[in-house]
Amino acid sequence: MRILKPHLRSTSIQCYLCLLLNSHFLTEAGIHVFILGCISAGLPKTEANWQFVIRDLEKIDNIIQSIHIDTTLYTESDAHPSCKVTAMKCFLLELRVISLEFKHHVLNETVENLIFLANDRLSSNGDITETGCKECEELEEKNIKEFLQSFVHIVQMFINTS
């Protein structure tokens, strides 16, 4: 399975150390490379953009229309901004249901990519504890079209606050 990781990078200090320790890199240029490498390793990584999550939601919507999936999923239709992380986690759990119930390669790959991107973005919020929010099972079950529309709305809440 190929997971797309747009805008993600990682820097390894070991590579720069290896280059520096080789005798022919003990020059002024080699030292500059080492210092710049150390500085870039300390910079925060660029995270996936919520726009890629919306793109994957649109792709899922197109796939669902083409293979005529008719299912109901727990859907948060009017999430309060203070409960957006909880709502997002519920949406991601319900996406796993789609992936497990429907054996469609492109659909499953897109769902997994979307889950990866959203979880990566959520991890930047740390361990936020939201109180007074509905549990996933307390949400109303709606058809998949309404589920995806509500999902886009939640993602837009994240975009508007970042």
Curated annotation (Swiss-Prot):
One of its GO terms (cellular component) is extracellular space. It comes from the Eukaryota. GO terms for biological process: immune response; interleukin-15-mediated signaling pathway; neutrophil activation; positive regulation of cytokine production; positive regulation of immune response; positive regulation of peptidyl-tyrosine phosphorylation; positive regulation of phagocytosis; positive regulation of T cell proliferation. Keywords: Cytokine, Disulfide bond, Glycoprotein, Secreted, Signal. The keyword Secreted applies. Residues 30-48 form a propeptide. It is found in: Secreted. Residues 1-29 form the signal peptide. GO terms for molecular function: cytokine activity; cytokine receptor binding. This is Interleukin-15. It comes from Ailuropoda melanoleuca (Giant panda). The gene is IL15.
